[in-house]
Amino acid sequence: MRTVVALRFLALSAAAAFFAPVPAGAQSGPEVARTYREANEAALVRDFATLLSYPNVASDSVNIRRTAAYIRDELSAVGVAARLLEVPGAPPLVYGTLTVPGATRTLGVYVHYDGQPVNPEEWSHAPFEPTLYTRAMEADGQPVALPADGAAVDPESRIYARSAGDDKAPIAAILPVLRAFRESGVTPTSNLVFLLDGEEEAGSPHLRQYLETYRELWDPVDLWLFFDGPAHQSGRPQLTFGVRGTMGMQVTVYGAVRNLHSGHYGNWAPDTPLVLADLLRSMKDPYTGEVLVEGFYDTVEPLGAEERAALAALPAYDEELKKELGMLWSEGEPATLAERLMLPSLTIRGMTAANTGALATNVVPNEATAALGIRLVKGNDPAHMRGLVEAHIRKQGYHIVREDPDMETRLRYEKIAKVTGGGGYPAARSSMSHPRIQEVIAAAGAAADRAFGEGSLVLTPALGGSLPLYLFTDVLERPFVNVPVANHDNNQHAADENLRIANLWYAIDLYAALLTMPQGGIS
């Protein structure tokens, strides 16, 4: 407890020295941030490239620690009292505070600094060697050198690297906001608590432990802002008030004990990829998208009136999105994408059986495996949903095992499925009418109006992706708002991930607005 008190005292002292009084008639927070950005665009792009050059896969313990230390030092340089928190066997959590004298509202800021694993062979450039393009690659953009001081930066240019969109962009945007405030004497209207997660892409398995171990550090927070995710598919900025939960399972079916010559044994030995496809087809209609697992939709919590109204007000963009993605149809038509995201989903996220392409051989594969991705909505429990899927597999006549079957098991059961995985976390949702959330909506709406025109902000009941936000509503008992800034076509989780520079500029403006929003702040 002494450590926590000392940290708060140091943060308060630093803030008092950091923020000088602002003369009457001075620029607003967003104006100060915009002026700073316009004068330093080239340097900001280079700083972003430096951040992106730090490898950040959670399982790479050496580099993930280097990344955490770099971010800690960058936060410290702009006046945040930052340090690394530790629990056994986990990447460090970057924690920081900025205490504002007289502030009566405390905002928590969540960002994750880890990224998805990479396969360099799939990338046009090395994933941790950031490369600037004049436009998106798909729009015939060309690679260019990072800008020198004074050089113009085209807002339509894009920087390509792992985590450019998910989720280092918020870090690259919040740092110049705090630096601009420091240099201009602008005082935030809220105390700030920073939490940077180092294993979100791995499911944040230690986040609960961090929240419980250091509970006193999070208790002052009134509202959590989650800086993660993409803009609406229409390109308009959005706020989201919920996220889907997630879980994964892996299913393997078996034939012979080894791969067999397809000439000698084909048309006789079990064709395991086809057997697996039949099992998967029994789980879901590939055209309607309906999951056929009994009870899959039974625990879905109905949307409230405010969520239904928000859904009805969303811009119609499905047809344009289909054209952009080269699709003539979608699952569940005529339901919209936004409506479909309000339901749990089952996706076949990967399949393996022998080899393809240049490595293909004339064999009957001895086994075939599918990785299942299941997204959850409010009301779904991960363990319960796993149980439903396993019950469905058993109804198809399978004996379920947890390890590869031995010969005795193979000769006892005709149909065997190894089922593993199943961890994950539930969905979370906050009320859009919460007073603190209404403050965020007002500030974000003003920022969106300035950048995109009046009425541009989209309010979405829940993001399609997943974040462990249930820990903040269920463990810390605090509301949250998700504040996405990445372009919707940022290739999140895929090769050639990127960020459109205009989205970085908007993030700077938006964060400046949130950090200086009125009501409930300075007394």
Range-by-range predicted roles:
Residues R8-P21:
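Bacterial N-terminal signal peptides
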Residues A256-E320:
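Polar, glycine-rich mid-to-C-terminal structural blocks
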Residues G165, V257-N259, Y265-G266, G373-P382, ...:
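A generic structural motif
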Residues A103, Q233-S234, L292-E367, R375-H392, ...:
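An extended, acidic, His-containing surface patch that forms the Zn2+-binding/catalytic region
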Residues Q27-A164, I171, E183-S190, L372:
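Acidic/His- and Gly-rich active-site-bordering loop/insert found
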Residues Y113-G115, L195-S204, F227-H232, G255-V257, ...:
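Acidic, glycine-rich active-site loops and adjacent beta-strand->loop/helix elements
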Residues A152-G242, I522-S523:
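Acidic/histidine-rich catalytic neighborhood of metal-dependent amide-processing enzymes
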Residues V22-A26:
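Sec/Tat signal peptide C-region and signal peptidase I cleavage site
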